[in-house]
UniProtKB/Swiss-Prot annotation:
This is CDGSH iron-sulfur domain-containing protein 1. L-cysteine transaminase that catalyzes the reversible transfer of the amino group from L-cysteine to the alpha-keto acid 2-oxoglutarate to respectively form 2-oxo-3-sulfanylpropanoate and L-glutamate. The catalytic cycle occurs in the presence of pyridoxal 5'-phosphate (PLP) cofactor that facilitates transamination by initially forming an internal aldimine with the epsilon-amino group of active site Lys-55 residue on the enzyme (PLP-enzyme aldimine), subsequently displaced by formation of an external aldimine with the substrate amino group (PLP-L-cysteine aldimine). It catalyses: L-cysteine + 2-oxoglutarate = 2-oxo-3-sulfanylpropanoate + L-glutamate. Residues 32-108 are cytoplasmic.
Length: 108
């Protein structure tokens, strides 16, 4: 085997390894971007309400509701858990379409 053919094989080997490494890097970055999900939601919904609780739950007796009750679902209301219309500004800023939860007695 001459020096020229050995050198040629080495150049081909380096080129093949470079292409394989580049392809592997692009594949890894694509995998991380599209398939690996971060378990923490980067756009938190609840920004300031009862942050010391692991889960926020509000329960109401049906008898206490009266004829109609309107509850916040965007977590932006100053009267939380009741809706004050803050979702309108939230929807304009984010392009979201969230609205309140409205509970009313059935007409008999």
């Amino acid at each position: 085997m001459s020096l020229t053919s050995s050198s040629s094989v080495r150049v081909e080997w380096i080129a093949a390894v470079t292409i394989a490494a580049g392809t592997a890097a692009i594949g890894y970055l694509a995998y991380k971007r599209f398939y690996v999900k971060d378990h923490r939601n980067k756009a938190m919904i609840n920004l300031h309400i009862q942050k010391d609780n692991p889960k926020i739950v509000h329960a109401f007796d049906m008898e206490d509701l009266g004829d109609k009750a309107v509850y916040c679902r965007c977590w932006r209301s100053k009267k939380f858990p009741f809706c004050d219309g803050a979702h309108t500004k939230h929807n304009e800023e984010t392009g979201d379409n969230v609205g309140p939860l409205i509970i009313k007695k059935k007409e008999t």
